[in-house]
Curated annotation (Swiss-Prot):
Subunit structure: Component of the ClpX-ClpP complex. Forms a hexameric ring that, in the presence of ATP, binds to fourteen ClpP subunits assembled into a disk-like structure with a central cavity, resembling the structure of eukaryotic proteasomes.
Gene Ontology MF terms in the entry: ATP binding; ATP hydrolysis activity; ATP-dependent protein folding chaperone; protein dimerization activity; unfolded protein binding; zinc ion binding
Name of the protein in its database record: ATP-dependent Clp protease ATP-binding subunit ClpX
Entry-linked InterPro entries: AAA+_ATPase (IPR003593), ATP-dep_Clp_protease_ClpX (IPR050052), ATPase_AAA_core (IPR003959), Clp_ATPase_C (IPR019489), Clp_protease_ATP-bd_su_ClpX (IPR004487), ClpX_bact (IPR046425), P-loop_NTPase (IPR027417), Znf_CppX_C4 (IPR010603)
Family as reported in the entry's similarity comment: Belongs to the ClpX chaperone family.
SUPFAM superfamilies for the chain: Glucocorticoid receptor-like (DNA-binding domain), P-loop containing nucleoside triphosphate hydrolases
ClpX-type ZB domain segment(s): 1-54
Residues that coordinate or bind ATP: 118-125
Length: 419
């Protein structure tokens, strides 16, 4: 290695020997210096060695049918929403490619997406899976934690910081990522008329989100929190970031009914009401979102609206068993690591699905239900070497008995609960 400074007392790179006057930047470490050129060379060598690829080749974005097919590996049902998302995402990244090559004088505008569907219907999972398919940075934010600048709460710029962190602070990659904002219906204003008083967690948040949804160069504090004078800020262009917002929008079906001038007479079964609500939900238009409490400018920046249906019993059973990362497969694998086979009786899966529907948690609540059933099993099995199989029966799923354990000699015993 070279000395830290030459005869004239100038600092120099410990690797290539260039002085600080010969390079753009010299970074100091404990007893060592490295120049920007050597840093760049090191990065190239590491990328070559590890085979690090770019996040996504925008010239080869998967076709809508391919995107929907991959989504179906992880998300059960919701075909209408998957189609809408596949088309919107394909067009979004095709637009980025078109605007970057500048072959056409027509500049394509951005199509952010609004997902409307009940809790646990798969809104977040769809957004996460899209990001995984495209291998782009992804961040999730909760709209209820946001407030407009100057008030106690989280600034909207902190959403962008999460995306930058997801891209390992590579701003260029973050600028082509996906941000999912959940619970967007919770920032609807209380009435469709503009508010006279400040609504800092409702209409104020919508106003604050407008610029980043449309596309602007935002200044983001690198450590999060509020901006301070003399603080170095990260500049990020949001023009190519795809924003997906989601919410349950409870009660929007009634708004659609009123718009269509339809009245429901009499009392139907729960199933009939569910089907009826889903029919109206699929007919949501921007005018209905305005009535619900989103401001016109905000709705204008969400041109793609996709609706998701409430998951029924059959769909929840499929979610438990069919996807690549299905919960039943995960728990089977966990017990497999202890050399124990796990079996769920078909009727037990139906009971788990019924419980999720009763709790009104949809697919989101399935894991907590299984955790509750499996608690004693997962506590006991690691300490035993005579168990070969665990059976979850219908009664065990209902909480009426403990799961059954099969021993090496083939005998079946109930698990003993410990205090």
């Amino acid at each position: 290695m070279f000395k830290f400074n030459d005869e004239k007392g100038q600092l120099k790179c410990s690797f290539c020997g260039k002085t600080q006057d010969q390079v753009r930047k010299l970074v100091a470490g404990p007893g060592v210096y490295i120049c920007d050129e050597c840093i760049e060379l090191c990065n190239e060598i590491i990328e070559e060695e590890l085979g690090i690829s770019e996040f996504v080749d925008f010239g080869e974005v998967p076709k809508p049918q391919e995107i929907r097919h991959i989504l179906s590996d992880y998300v059960i049902g919701q075909e209408r929403a998957k189609k809408a998302l596949a088309v919107a995402v394909y067009n979004h990244y095709k637009r980025i490619n078109s605007n970057e090559t500048k072959e056409d004088e027509v500049e394509l505008s951005k199509s952010n997406i609004c997902l409307i569907g009940p809790t646990g219907s798969g809104k977040t999972l769809l957004a996460q899976t899209l990001a995984r398919i495209l291998n782009v940075p992804f961040a999730i934010a909760d709209a209820t934690s946001l407030t407009e600048a100057g008030y106690v709460g989280e600034d909207v710029e902190n959403i962008l910081l999460k995306l930058i962190q997801s891209a390992d602070y590579d701003v260029e990659k973050a600028e082509k990522g996906i941000i999912y904002i959940d619970e967007i219906d919770k920032v609807a204003r209380k009435s469709e008329n503009p508010s006279i008083t400040r609504d800092v967690s409702g209409e104020g948040v919508q106003q604050a989100l407008l610029k980043i949804l449309e596309g602007t160069v935002a200044s983001v504090p690198p450590q999060g929190g509020r901006k301070h004078p003399h603080q170095e800020l990260i500049q990020i262009d949001t023009g190519n970031i795809l924003f997906i917002v989601g919410g349950a929008f409870d009660g929007i079906e009634q708004i659609v009914k009123n718009r269509m001038g339809e009245k429901v007479i009499g009392f139907g079964t729960d199933n009939a009401k569910l089907k009826e609500d889903e029919t109206y939900l699929s007919r949501v238009v921007p005018e209905d979102l305005l009535k619900f409490g989103l401001i016109p400018e905000f709705i204008g920046r969400l041109p793609v609206i996709a609706t998701l249906e409430q998951l029924d019993e059959a769909a929840l059973v499929s979610i438990l068993t069919e996807p690549k990362n299905a919960l039943v497969k995960q728990y089977k694998r966990m017990l497999e690591l202890d050399d124990v086979e796990l079996e769920f009786e078909p009727t037990a899966l139906i009971e788990i699905a019924k419980e999720a529907i009763e709790r009104k948690t949809g697919a989101r609540g399935l894991r907590s239900i299984i955790e509750q059933i499996m608690l004693e099993v997962m506590f006991e099995i690691p300490s035993r070497d005579d168990i070969t199989k665990c059976i979850i029966t219908e009664k065990a799923a209902r909480g009426e008995e403990e799961p059954q354990l099969q021993l090496e000699d083939g005998s079946i015993i109930p698990i003993k609960t410990s205090a």
